Curated annotation (Swiss-Prot):
GO terms for molecular function: rRNA binding; structural constituent of ribosome. Component of the large ribosomal subunit. Pfam families: Ribosomal_L2, Ribosomal_L2_C. One of its GO terms (biological process) is translation. InterPro entries: NA-bd_OB-fold (IPR012340), Rib_uL2_dom2 (IPR014722), Ribosomal_uL2 (IPR002171), Ribosomal_uL2_arc_euk (IPR023672), Ribosomal_uL2_C (IPR022669), Ribosomal_uL2_CS (IPR022671), Ribosomal_uL2_dom3 (IPR014726), Ribosomal_uL2_RNA-bd_dom (IPR022666). This is Large ribosomal subunit protein uL2. GO terms for cellular component: cytoplasm; large ribosomal subunit. It comes from Xenopus tropicalis (Western clawed frog). Keywords: Cytoplasm, Ribonucleoprotein, Ribosomal protein, RNA-binding, rRNA-binding. Belongs to the universal ribosomal protein uL2 family. Component of the large ribosomal subunit. The ribosome is a large ribonucleoprotein complex responsible for the synthesis of proteins in the cell. Its main location: cytoplasm.
């Protein structure tokens, strides 16, 4: 009998706790209020900061509270091209400039946006990773809905009252730079989660993994495995419908509708 394999140990583990010790806070849009719904409110970018475990930089934006004599600082996902000292305008009547926050229904078709709300008032859920953006495709004034194209390429119909930041998320091209050293990968995943290093099954001994052992590294058996296999054998391509490369498939032209 072999040892308890990695997949079994994982299933018996505790609930995941995010590594949030050095993080700067949750990046959100302003809570929607009367000033944003009917006009606009002005803020100033105080600082652009790095948040550990996140690819995109964050912008500290200071707003004067419209209801109390105090200032409020918000953490926005920084759009490409904003700078410290820049004025940021949030609201229905704000201008269409990089870094401003507007309802998607007021933006012309083809506008590039990021940190898009999925539901009105949820303060930004879509297109928030570094270099990502969504595109406003079309508006339906009768139903008050707007169609946007997400970074994955899928299209989503959302409410026209949903807000978004104009522009692309900063930090694009981050994954183009190779990691090169194990030390960099160590620090990267230390800030994110405990998932590194990951030893391959074929590099293990036979007691530690079904694919382990042998005079050279090879699986030595089919990598596909049935759905009802016991937990200690359930590794590889689980209940795969098909394997291998997609050969001879016809690329379908995407319809714009």
């Amino acid at each position: 009998m072999g040892r308890v394999i990695r997949g079994q140990r994982k299933g018996a583990g505790s609930v995941f706790k995010a590594h949030v010790k050095h993080r700067k806070g949750a990046a959100k849009l302003r809570a929607v209020d009367f000033a944003e719904r009917h006009g606009y409110i002005k803020g100033i970018v105080k600082d652009i900061i790095h948040d550990p475990g996140r690819g995109a930089p964050l912008a500290k934006v200071a707003f004067r509270d419209p209801y109390r004599f105090k200032k409020r600082t918000e953490l926005f996902v920084a759009a490409e091209g904003i700078h410290t000292g820049q004025f940021v305008y949030c609201g229905k009547k704000a201008q269409l400039n990089i870094g401003n926050v507007l309802p998607v229904g007021t933006m012309p078709e083809g506008t590039i946006v990021c940190c898009v709300e999925e539901k009105p008032g949820d303060r930004g859920k879509l297109a928030r990773a570094s270099g990502n953006y969504a595109t406003v495709i079309s508006h339906n004034p009768e139903t008050k809905k707007t169609r946007v194209k997400l970074p994955s390429g899928s299209k989503k119909v959302i409410s026209s009252a949903n807000r978004a930041i104009v522009g692309v998320v900063a930090g694009g091209g981050r994954i183009d730079k190779p990691i090169l050293k194990a030390g960099r990968a160590y620090h990267k995943y230390k800030a994110k989660r405990n998932c590194w290093p990951r030893v391959r099954g074929v590099a293990m001994n036979p007691v530690e993994h079904p694919f382990g052992g042998g005079n050279h590294q090879h699986i030595g058996k089919p990598s596909t495995i049935r759905r009802d296999a016991p937990a200690g054998r359930k590794v590889g391509l689980i209940a795969a419908r098909r394997t291998g490369r997609l050969r001879g498939t016809k690329t379908v032209q995407e319809k714009e509708n």
